[in-house]
């Protein structure tokens, strides 16, 4: 590359640095607590899951988010060792497994922390261990387990065709009448329910209506009827 080419490259590199910097330092105004249905995750992935999935919704992640504009990502970069997680490991493997590769749970938790959790701010999210403890508290203690919420509404993972409103209304019953966000994936001739997201305020003190939903025409849009779960 000649000098002229290098001169033209400088603004591009600078712009990229600014973009990354802004993305990692911006604030957020709510949290998404996203849980994924294991069989649907395996069915929608190009590479088969290494182990049979459980018929459960387990944690995908807890994500600081914005109702308008981009969400913050990669605010810090820190590798977490398995020994640091210590006695939390047994609980995390149950509620937050790496569904695609169960030999790499710690790698999955690292990716979720670095991309999303690291952008949380104290006192809501103080550090990586507090992030993991917060997720355990939400899923187990505060009963934000989507599988249990659906089960209380008599919606079980039986491979039946469901109505979107029935699923949404069931989640509303468990979240003080706040609207969740659904993600579906078309698989051959059926549309499977892949994820359900519960939203909370930026302090994780109360549920809110999820601001964003997949629009009609999106590959992740859930139809009014004919959702497999």
UniProtKB/Swiss-Prot annotation:
Catalytic activity, reaction form: a ribonucleotidyl-ribonucleotide-RNA + H2O = a 3'-end 3'-phospho-ribonucleotide-RNA + a 5'-end dephospho-ribonucleoside-RNA + H(+)
Top-rank EC class of the record's enzyme: lyase
InterPro entries reported in the protein's UniProt record: Ribonuclease_T2_eukaryotic, RNase_T2-like, RNase_T2-like_sf, RNase_T2_His_AS_1
Gene3D superfamilies: Ribonuclease T2-like
Residues annotated as signal peptide: 1-27
Residues at the active site: 60 (proton donor), 112, 116 (proton acceptor)
Record keyword Glycosyltransferase present: no
Highest rank taxon of the organism: Eukaryota
One Pfam match: Ribonuclease_T2
EC number: 4.6.1.19
Disulfide feature: 42-49, 75-119, 184-222, 199-210
Keyword Lyase attributed: yes
Gene Ontology cellular component annotations, sorted alphabetically: extracellular region
Alphabetic keyword roster: Disulfide bond, Endonuclease, Glycoprotein, Hydrolase, Lyase, Nuclease, Signal
Modification note: The N-glycans attached at Asn-188 and Asn-203 consist of either monosaccharide (GlcNAc) or disaccharide (GlcNAc-GlcNAc) that could not be distinguished.
Glycosylation sites: 77, 87, 145, 188, 203
Function: Self-incompatibility (SI) is the inherited ability of a flowering plant to prevent self-fertilization by discriminating between self and non-self pollen during pollination. In many species, self-incompatibility is controlled by the single, multiallelic locus S.
Family stated for the protein in its record: Belongs to the RNase T2 family.
Protein name: Ribonuclease S-6
Top-level taxonomy: Eukaryota, Viridiplantae, Streptophyta, Embryophyta, Tracheophyta
